[in-house]
Amino acid sequence: MDKIIFLDESYRLSSHPLIRKLEDDAFKQEVIKLLKIADFSIQDLTARRVERKEKNTILHDFDLNYAVIQEVDIDLHYLSFDENGAPTGTKTINWTMDSKGTVRMLYLATVMVDAHNKGKTIFIDEFDTAFHVSICEFLMAIMNSKRNANNQFIVTSHEIDLLDQPLRTDQIWFVNKSFKNKSELYSLFDFADLHKQRAHISYAKRYLKGE
């Protein structure tokens, strides 16, 4: 199962094993490099181990009433500017105070750096959540690059514009709910007119037209 990763909104990121790798400086620098390319303006980050007490609902002994959870707390460091646009230093924001999109991007960047050349299968539910379509396009380009030739990414999305990304037709699948409320899965590759050049077809437009 270490070759299979599921990314969803239910996992508490601060206690995720991958997030702990940000304590390693070399690993952290690779993640920051990816964040900079994605234009998130993060210059550095500080990761530190913290302990959190959690109510133990199984043990009733007074002394064993709490479990100690090891977590990682992260500060993100951004460039700051004066009113003329000149850099004045950095400002620090704890990741619990940053946007959902930034935290999610940090998580995905961590997963991608860790998965490099390891032959992993990564499932990402609601891939476009909290992301502008340009960020989704950037991430899909990385997923489909030679860097990730040994990995497989399986993502779900409601973002129609992603249909026009430079993907092979056998990489695009649709889920349709039948009148029996059963989900049916079918591939874009199964359509009969795929002898046309992929670049000449807007699948997003055709999908919206119901073609």
Where are the regions a protein language model picked out?
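The start of beta-strands in P-loop NTPase/AAA+ ATPase cores
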Residues: K91, K120-T121
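Short basic/glycine-enriched coil/helix segment immediately N-terminal to the Walker B
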Residues: M112-K120
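Conserved D-loop-proximal element of ABC-family nucleotide-binding domains
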Residues: T129-V133
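Phosphate-coordinating catalytic segments in nucleotide- and nucleic-acid-processing enzymes
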Residues: M1-M105
